[in-house]
Curated annotation (Swiss-Prot):
Residues 226-333 are annotated as: Dimerization. Belongs to the gammacoronavirus nucleocapsid protein family. This is Nucleoprotein. Residues 215-331 form the CoV N CTD domain. The gene is N.
Length: 409
């Protein structure tokens, strides 16, 4: 039985969640991490979880008599200025006799431990399930057939049939039942004119609200793949990934606003409706190969036709007008307001203000070195922090409905 012998392992999920199949392995491992993904508190200092049913995650490999264990609190932090900042706790499930509290019997009282058992479970028995080695095995998606945790907690929904190379976005189980917010209706955009941009921005908002997690390492990998396979990660500018915007040649799409906001700009997702898929680009393009001193250059010429009776035709035209050769420009509704006359009027001898008194300069305290900050974190906490790069709650903006279908993008 693998308990606390392993070192360097943690409850934190692997940097990239990979699912190898619908069932967790029957054989234990040498790691000390939970087989299952975590449930996460929505707020700091949330009370310990309560469950509608037994609280034991579904596992078809176990008999009913073996369905018992405990949920263990994992404190989480992210680095701040000179100190670490706490974030809401995560709770991980372990079978009785495994994990960090392997020496406890079922029901033993200990802070940060919540015992759970299915009806008919033999709580006096100890599990041979072991724990997970994150380097060898994937996390198993949480499923509760008889009810999950209370409303103070959430967990990321992961499809059971997703393979290791599959793509999906993790969706917050709590977010799926929330009604859309109406706050975005107060914005400047209204009517059908900007339906396309509104729908595109809503898709981005939904993806963020559903909790897609991208680590710092994954974002860097996305931005530095082979050029033709790159995608813009959250928080990156367009020119950081695809180079400066130009006019009249390759790289001529995007105005200054789009360059700064990257994928947060709703126009990006809107225009992706018109971008060909990989297969369409390969088999529907005029392909021109050309040998150059630095290698083989492949040119793909593809034409997407937007019918004039398309309900979003005018919006596509508007975006193209703004973004094709748009470097150095911004949308009219995004231009900064001109300063008032009083502030823009040149100063004269009669109107010049009296010189201000010089404030005493404060002595600059030497900043704490990075190694001093790092000393405040344990090795387990550092590994946890690696997962928190994009773990903050996204800003929820409801841009309204539009004419686009749900699955067009």
């Amino acid at each position: 039985m693998a308990s606390g012998k392993a070192t360097g392992k943690t409850d934190a999920p692997a940097p990239v969640i990979k699912l190898g199949g619908p069932r967790p392995p029957k054989v234990g491992s040498s790691g000390n991490a939970s087989w299952f993904q975590a449930i996460k508190a929505k707020k700091l200092n949330s009370p310990q979880p309560k469950f509608e049913g037994s609280g034991v995650p579904d596992n078809e490999n176990f008999k009913t008599s073996q369905q018992h264990g405990y949920w263990r609190r994992q404190a989480r932090f992210k680095p701040g200025k000179g100190r670490r900042k706490p974030v809401p706790d995560a709770w991980y499930f372990y079978y009785t006799g495994t994990g960090p509290a392997a020496d406890l019997n079922w029901g033993d009282s200990q802070d940060g431990i919540v015992w759970v058992a299915a009806k008919g479970a033999d709580v006096k028995s100890r599990s041979n399930q072991g724990t997970r080695d994150p380097d060898k095995f994937d996390q198993y998606p949480l499923r509760f057939s008889d009810g999950g945790p209370d409303g103070n907690f959430r967990w990321d929904f992961i499809p059971l049939n997703r393979g290791r190379s599959g793509r999906s976005t993790a969706a917050s189980s709590a977010a799926s039942s929330r009604p859309p917010s109406r706050e975005g209706s107060r914005g400047r955009r209204s009517g059908s004119e900007d339906d396309l941009i509104a729908r595109a921005a809503k898709i981005i908002q939904d993806q963020q609200k559903k909790g897609s997690r991208i680590t710092k390492a994954k974002a860097d990998e996305m931005a530095h793949r082979r050029y033709c396979k790159r995608t813009i990660p959250p928080g990156y500018k367009v020119d950081q990934v695809f180079g400066p915007r130009t006019k009249g040649k390759e790289g001529n799409f995007g105005d200054d606003k789009m360059n700064e906001e990257g994928i947060k700009d709703g126009r990006v997702t809107a225009m992706l409706n018109l971008v060909p898929s990989s297969h369409a680009c390969l088999f529907g393009s005029r392909v021109t190969p050309k040998l150059q001193p630095d290698g083989l250059h492949l040119k793909f010429e593809f034409t997407t036709v937007v019918p004039r009776d398309d309900p979003q035709f005018d919006n596509y035209v508007k975006i193209c007008d703004q973004c094709v050769d748009g470097v150095g420009t911004r949308p009219k509704d995004d231009e900064p307001k001109p300063k008032s006359r009083s502030s823009s009027r040149p100063a004269t001898r009669t109107s010049s203000p009296a010189p201000r008194q010089q404030r005493l300069k404060k002595e600059k305290r030497p900043k704490k070195q990075d190694d001093e900050v790092d000393k405040a974190l344990t090795s387990d906490e550092e590994r946890n922090n690696a997962q928190l790069e994009f773990d903050d709650e996204p800003k929820v903006i409801n841009w309204g409905d539009s004419a686009l279908g749900e699955n067009e993008l």
